[in-house]
Swiss-Prot record:
PANTHER family: FERM DOMAIN-CONTAINING PROTEIN 8, KREV INTERACTION TRAPPED 1-RELATED
SUPFAM superfamilies, per database record: PH domain-like (SSF50729), Second domain of FERM (SSF47031), Ubiquitin-like (SSF54236)
Transmembrane segments: none
Coiled-coil ranges (or none): none
A GO BP entry: regulation of sorocarp development
Record-given protein name: FERM domain-containing protein B
Organism: Dictyostelium discoideum
Ranges of Low complexity composition bias in the record: 22-39, 129-164, 180-189, 204-216
């Protein structure tokens, strides 16, 4: 594996280099505004250099024609460059990301269309201050429609994806069709360049590809690190980066079946990101174990000079919800001895050990959305959460996490009665108890990404229901 894909970043990778470099001024009008032009005979007239990032901020540089390179083709190029085979590569795809939100690219949309539509998507889903819901927010599932499960629209788009029109599943509808219930109105028209499902689509025929609608319905995740754009020469239009990382609907059994070094590394750095950013909140003893593994993988066997490195880079090793509880010297005294015990350990085995620890958590592999909890009543003492929380969605169910308080609540898909979304909120109702003797419990959240949460739950619900049917069928055969 090339050094730029390793956890340690080279000096060159930390520079604010030009990352999108038109080779001739007669290139794409939307991509040729840069005053910096690199002369290289190896690039075609319409080729540009872009950086594909990984979750740990390392990157690979590729040459593409943005007007004729699709998300699917870019995914294939990166997978090949990393040496990830066809089976393993199905677990990954390319995301468009800024510091507030991430979007899974649409398979067949050109990269130039992704750039063109990024501003629209950002405006729609990153505006967190306007139209804030109050605790009295009305929602269909809180108004007597508790028997309805929320679902994406199943309507097939017949519009051309290139014109950005249509109202297919990408429109982010709330409760499903077939329920006879209207949902909050979605903005008219799809948005080109972004995938409508939380997983990578199977290959489609050209006829189907030309009919797909186009709004991402998957990922929202805040990032503490400063954004490094894949297209800095485009100014505001290109203030996002392309990131190659796992898809959002990835069954844990499938992930565990993959053991190649390249794929394992991608899962490993994704887990580190979620641990350090407290998306995976853990107790101190577990955090120390994970930090020691990370340190051994990064710097090798313990040496005196590593102690200074650890203190200077402590925020890369200790989860954010624990960091302020001790001084850097105290963390050093706790981590370094455990690091010493790992002397001579194989890096790949350590990465797998790190993943195995994280995979025990119910919320492992979740897609996380930042939200504000809106209490259903005004009593301070009966409020389950206070203010900002993370909503996690994975194959196990729906998770509400407050890492500062180390408080987590999880519900399986069989517990979900209904869910609904608006442009600025998300509401979900669960059943508490067994059989006919159960109570209902609603949660209301302020978030501009309610439609995305809605659709991702739909994707995972379908996955869960399919698995349940298979298990029931297998049990009847016995």
């Amino acid at each position: 594996m090339e050094s730029s894909f390793e956890a340690s970043k080279s000096l060159n990778e930390n520079r604010d280099d030009i990352e999108l470099i038109p080779t001739q001024s007669q290139g794409s009008p939307s991509l040729s505004s840069s005053s910096t032009i690199t002369s290289t005979s190896r690039l075609g007239s319409n080729q540009v250099l872009i950086r594909i990032y990984f979750i740990d901020d390392t990157h690979k540089t590729l040459s593409i024609d943005p007007n004729n390179t699709t998300g699917d083709q870019l995914w294939e190029m990166v997978s090949e460059k990393l040496g990830i085979n066809n089976r393993d590569s199905e677990c990954f795809f390319v995301w468009a990301q800024n510091d507030e939100i991430e979007w899974l690219l649409f398979n067949h949309q050109n990269i130039s269309e992704v750039i063109k539509n990024w501003g629209i998507l950002k405006k729609r889903y990153c505006n967190t201050e306007e139209n804030s819901p109050s605790s009295s927010t009305s929602s269909p599932i809180l108004s007597g429609l508790s028997s309805i499960r929320g679902k994406k629209s199943n309507a097939s788009s017949t519009s051309n994806a290139n014109d950005g029109s249509g109202s297919g599943s990408g429109s982010g509808s709330g409760s499903g069709s077939g329920s006879g219930t209207s949902t909050p109105n979605s903005p008219k028209g799809g948005l080109s360049g972004f995938l409508t499902l939380g997983r990578k689509n199977k290959a489609q025929s050209p006829q189907l590809q030309s009919q797909s609608s186009s709004l991402s319905t998957t990922i929202a995740s805040e990032h503490a690190s400063k954004l490094r754009s894949s297209f800095p020469t485009l100014g505001e239009e290109g203030q996002f980066r392309l990131v190659y990382r796992p898809t959002s609907v990835l069954p844990l059994e499938l992930e565990r079946s993959i053991n190649t070094a390249e794929a394992t590394h991608l899962f490993y750095i994704q887990a580190i990101h979620n641990v350090i950013n407290s998306n995976y909140p853990c107790e101190e003893d577990v955090a120390l174990k994970l930090a020691s593994i990370q340190l051994q993988v990064l710097v090798g066997d313990q040496k005196m000079e590593h102690q200074d490195h650890f203190k200077e880079s402590i925020s890369r090793y200790i989860p954010s919800h624990l960091l302020s509880k001790r001084k850097a010297e105290e963390w050093e005294q706790l981590v370094i001895p455990q690091h010493s015990l790992l002397r001579g350990s194989d890096s790949l085995q350590l990465k797998r050990a790190y993943l195995e620890t994280c995979q025990r958590w119910a919320y492992y592999g979740s897609t996380f959305f930042k939200a504000k909890y809106i209490p259903a009543n005004t009593s301070f003492f009966t409020q389950e959460f206070q203010g900002k929380v993370s909503i996690g969605i994975n194959g196990n169910g729906f998770h509400i996490i407050d890492p500062k308080e180390m408080k987590m609540v999880s519900y399986s898909y069989r517990d979900i009665i209904a869910w609904d979304s608006t442009s600025n909120s998300f509401t979900i109702k669960f059943k508490i108890g067994q059989d006919k003797k159960f109570e209902t419990k609603p949660y209301i959240f302020k978030t501009p990404q309610g439609e995305l949460i809605n659709d991702l739950i739909s994707d995972w619900s379908e996955e869960w229901e399919s698995k349940e049917k298979k298990n029931n069928k297998d049990s009847k055969k016995k």
